[in-house]
Amino acid sequence: MGSPHENDSDLPVFLTWRLRDSLPFSRASPRDARHCGSAFVATDRLLDEVSCGPVHLREPAVAEMVVMALQHNANILGHYRLHAFVVMPNHVHLLATPAVELPAMTAAFKEITAERANALLVLPASPFWQEEDYHRTVRYEGEFEEIWNYIEENPVRAGMVKEATEYRWSSASTDAIILQGSQYHVTSIRSSKTGWDNVLTWQDW
């Protein structure tokens, strides 16, 4: 196990955001346990297995918009340094080092993606994301690597692909992300495990 960071302000954070009502109330983790490791693993497994609830992120246009938002908020707005991410049908995992307060970082992402997703899905303006989230501060290098792999292997664990690189809406993807239409274009280049670099053009965001 590596040495812990000395300064909490530069610590990476493992975040999970899920869709509103993506888990039945009776099976959602209690509020006071949602940052507990065992509770998180159980909840994450349920998110991959649950047969009810919204799966809006399964829609390609919505998933691509969310990926774009993750990169835009990192590379253009500078809210965080993005290390790894995956967009699953009903939740998002990311590993990032925040440059702003975590509540502000989360609120900015959820606000713009909720607005865009509701428009893409032709849904009435309503809560899109579950209000509470899971977050864990990463203090050791070994833990950083484990979480990075955990995130990128999520589609494999869920039986969606055989190899992590086959899943398009993930930092593991070997494909460039090209959004349909003339409005958006992004070419993503995965670097070493220090961040996510890209060449980005995003008009009318």
Regions found by a protein language model. Give the residues of each.
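Short catalytic/metal-binding and nucleic-acid-binding patches
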Residues: 1-205
